[in-house]
Amino acid sequence: MKQFREFIREGISTDTKELTELLVDTVYSHYIDDHDKNSIECVGWLDGTENAQLRFQKIYEAGIDEKDSVLDVGCGVAHLHTYLKNQGWNGKYLGIDPNKKAIDLVDENINAVHATVEDIGKNEKWDWAIANGVFNLGLKEEHSFWIIEHMISHANKGIIFNMLQAPYPDSNYVAYYPEQIKHKLSRFDHSKIEIVENYMPKDAEFTVYFYV
């Protein structure tokens, strides 16, 4: 007989999948339809190329080495892959995204599939699991941490993700206090947790380095 905790976890899993599908249908598919795949707007970044590059820089600065493997959760059209290649990185890459329209636009030489992090085999590991902009819209805290927990389970070195910083002026988005996130992450086995702030105009977001 299933334990109560198992029912709760199954409920969160189902809710996360349903919310993700809803976001794809109502939001992200329209960005793909309306913008060129080489633009950052096609994956929902509406604050300019300079800010998008800054996000990639902060992700890279977590310590991604030249041959490190990367699992890109919510990869969109794999812009992160392009950025890493431009830094001299040459590791194994898998991009996953629930938006099939986005995956269909990814260059054929880039390993990307229509999937979510729950679809990844339990024993599959990458040095880094990365989520760029995944937690900004439509997912409640419990759903975001469901994804984060799965990312940790697939990481050899660590996970990297960013979030909007509370208080955030637009209530349509989901924002968090950095110390709140650090506290919640501390329950997972780790060697270090680092919060990177003060890099974005108006301190609008922060990046988390979680080292396993």
Feature locations, PLM:
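Conserved acidic residues
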Residues: 68, 127, 157
